[in-house]
Every structure is written in C-alpha cells, then in structure tokens.
Amino acid sequence: MELVFIRHGQSEWNAKNLFTGWRDVKLSEQGLAEAAAAGKKLKENGYEFDIAFTSVLTRAIKTCNIVLEESDQLFVPQIKTWRLNERHYGQLQGLDKKQTAEQYGDEQVRIWRRSYDTLPPLLDKDDEFSAHKDRRYAHLPADVVPDGENLKVTLERVLPFWEDQIAPAILSGKRVLVAAHGNSLRALAKHIEGISDEDIMGLEIPTGQPLVYKLDDNLKVIEKFYL
C-alpha cells in the first residue's frame, strides 16, 4: 500500500518569510510552478489516486487541484477538512520571522516554530483575523476553534481525521493523496513513523515535493522517499 503526501507549493507568505498558520494566502508564482511540476512527476512515475484529502486553506486546495490536473486526474474526489489545516501560529501569524527573532531571540522563535509542546502567544478571539470570525469554521463549537497551537495540539486535531477517514481509505485499497501543510504533515509523519517528541523538531517537509510512503497491512512504514 502507498500513501502520498505533498506540502502545498510555496505561498506568497513563505516567499516573504512570514508566519502564516490559519491565515489564507495564495500560492506564489514559484508555488504554482512547484505544484505543476509535482503533478507532472507523479504522472511520469505512474501514480494514480482514488481519493485526495486536503485542508480548507486556499494554498493546499490549489496545490491539490493543480497536482491532479497536471497528472490528468482532476476527476478524483477531494475531501476538504479543517483538521488538515496548518498549525495555528496564534499572535505570530502575519509577523516577519526575521524581525520576530530580532525581538524575541533566535532560540525563542526556534522553540515556537519547532518545539513539540510549546504554544505560541494566543490570538485574541476578537482579533479581526481570528478563525472564530471565519465562516469556514462557523459549524464548529467555539472551544474547538484554536487561537494558537503547538505540534502536539496539531496532532490531536489531525489524528481523528487520520483514524476516521485516511487510514480506512488506505486499508480499503484506495490510493490516497494528502495535500496539506508543513506542520499538519509533520504531525501525521510523527504518528505513522513513530518519531519521538525530540526528533520531530528536526523534521522539515519541503514545499511542492511528493513524499511517498510504502506501508504494510498495519500501516507501518516499510519505505519512504521523495520523488
């Protein structure tokens, strides 16, 4: 059994080195090209999908669409879920990473970005960019919508969707594509690879590169590689 992850192509805020999180930004020109190249590469290597899962953020949805279009599979059903959203960066969202490091120190920013269980400063629910004011999440209970997350909380958000939707799809024989975000994919990788809380800090998933997992019947990783 195989599972393919792809982190969205470079976004406009990736290019500007800004914290993005749940803020909805578009792909950059480079990001569009990365997604198209990924789709072509998947086609060249014979990858076909029966179902695709993505987030409710534009950069991941667009990447998913482009990948499927460039691999002649735009007909493949897509399921969009907030549970695959990027980690919510709280008050850091929209801030320049370099300027934030100058203000708080490199080590503090590194911990905010990479630590498994350290939360960023939480965003006020009344902030104009709060997810509580976004109709994408209007169906969710207020106490479920995050104001800031670490990777641990992100995994707790993503895991129910893995167990309820993604894993059963794989086990039923479906060929699955997950087009999501750096941290939601890191959370899933931590779970399926059994990565420790410490080692996950060093895992980086590049934009726009298909990551293939070969899995056994228990969804244990036999092999992983980038195309």
Swiss-Prot record:
Pathway: Carbohydrate degradation; glycolysis; pyruvate from D-glyceraldehyde 3-phosphate: step 3/5. One of its GO terms (biological process) is gluconeogenesis. Catalyzes the interconversion of 2-phosphoglycerate and 3-phosphoglycerate. The active site is at 8 (tele-phosphohistidine intermediate), 86 (proton donor/acceptor). The record marks 181 as: Transition state stabilizer. Gene3D superfamilies: Phosphoglycerate mutase-like. Pfam families: His_Phos_1. It catalyses: (2R)-2-phosphoglycerate = (2R)-3-phosphoglycerate. InterPro entries: His_Pase_superF_clade-1, His_PPase_superfam, Phosphogly_mut1. Belongs to the phosphoglycerate mutase family. BPG-dependent PGAM subfamily. This is 2,3-bisphosphoglycerate-dependent phosphoglycerate mutase. Homodimer. It comes from the Bacteria. Coiled coil: none annotated. Its EC number is 5.4.2.11. Keywords: Gluconeogenesis, Glycolysis, Isomerase. GO terms for molecular function: phosphoglycerate mutase activity. Substrate binds at residues 7-14, 20-21, 59, 86-89, 97, 113-114, 182-183.
